[in-house]
């Protein structure tokens, strides 16, 4: 099956149009945490895609466990296993500790998972021709809020390094769904659905279009943006995007390290002066 982002977005939008009001048992006039609404909406998107793409839609940890079962059935050994190619593996591999207990303990879902949902082009799963890694974000139209954390910039730089240094053509896409909702009674109504491709967002001020992709170095080095507010103007290949992102990442990292080293030098000089005057060290 050929997967197209527009078709996936359309399936989700039509689902919410038909769904209408979603009762979440919210208490009236009470502030609710983002997760109180965001988590049920993630489940709604999962339901929408499961109906549109049956047998090809998984939560990330479900996809890993199904793939491991598939490899065992084929007589392959999952120990130290690579999920698909090395690039995809760097995004989804749960680590040696989680795999060492499999199958006695299945791979669990984690908050740090790259994707809420994984959509495959065919039943070969990670060995197939296309892997959609989909993360769901949501925001209340009635509130002003900061752009959410999207993913670790360090993780993204690592997958860029793998693809570029080993000449691996990405068979994966990083998609972000933004659900704009309004509260109503004890629930919400999703009024807007926007789906964007990470590798169509200009990582730098590319060709005079857009702004540099923002990396918050103070918040666990996270790429941050609101999916409904970014441009999709990057027109080169995925490999080109990864190269430009690496340029953005390394430039910002170099500037930050230089600043930290400069501050450290000033602090060490200050400490040395204090030590000489106080004679207590």
How would you describe each model-predicted region?
Residues 1-113, 119-132, 138-281:
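Nucleic-acid endonuclease domains
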């Amino acid at each position: 099956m050929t997967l197209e982002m527009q078709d996936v977005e359309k399936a989700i939008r039509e689902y919410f149009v038909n769904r209408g009001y979603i009762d979440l048992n919210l208490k009236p006039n009470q502030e609710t945490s983002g997760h109180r609404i965001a988590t049920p909406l993630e489940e709604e998107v999962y339901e929408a895609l499961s109906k549109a793409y049956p047998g090809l839609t998984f939560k990330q940890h479900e996809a890993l466990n199904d793939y491991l079962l598939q490899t065992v059935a084929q007589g392959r050994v999952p120990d130290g296993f690579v999920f698909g190619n090395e690039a995809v593996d760097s995004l989804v591999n749960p680590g040696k500790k989680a795999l060492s207990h499999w199958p006695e303990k299945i791979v669990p879902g984690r908050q740090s998972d790259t994707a809420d949902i994984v959509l495959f082009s065919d039943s070969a799963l990670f060995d197939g021709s296309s892997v959609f890694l989909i993360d769901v974000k949501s925001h209340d139209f009635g509130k002003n809020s900061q752009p959410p954390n999207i993913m670790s910039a360090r993780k993204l730089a690592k997958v860029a390094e793998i693809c570029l240094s080993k000449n691996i053509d990405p068979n994966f896409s990083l998609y972000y769904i933004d659900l704009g909702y309004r509260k109503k009674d004890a629930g919400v109504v999703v009024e807007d659905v926007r789906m964007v491709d990470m590798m169509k967002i200009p990582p730098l001020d590319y060709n005079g279009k857009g702004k540099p992709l923002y990396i918050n170095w103070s918040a666990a080095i996270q790429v941050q943006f609101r999916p409904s507010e970014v441009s999709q103007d990057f027109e080169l290949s995925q490999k080109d995007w990864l190269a430009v992102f690496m340029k953005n990442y390394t430039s910002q990292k170099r500037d930050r390290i230089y600043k930290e080293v400069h501050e450290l030098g000033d602090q060490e000089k200050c400490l040395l002066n204090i030590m000489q005057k106080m004679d207590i060290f």
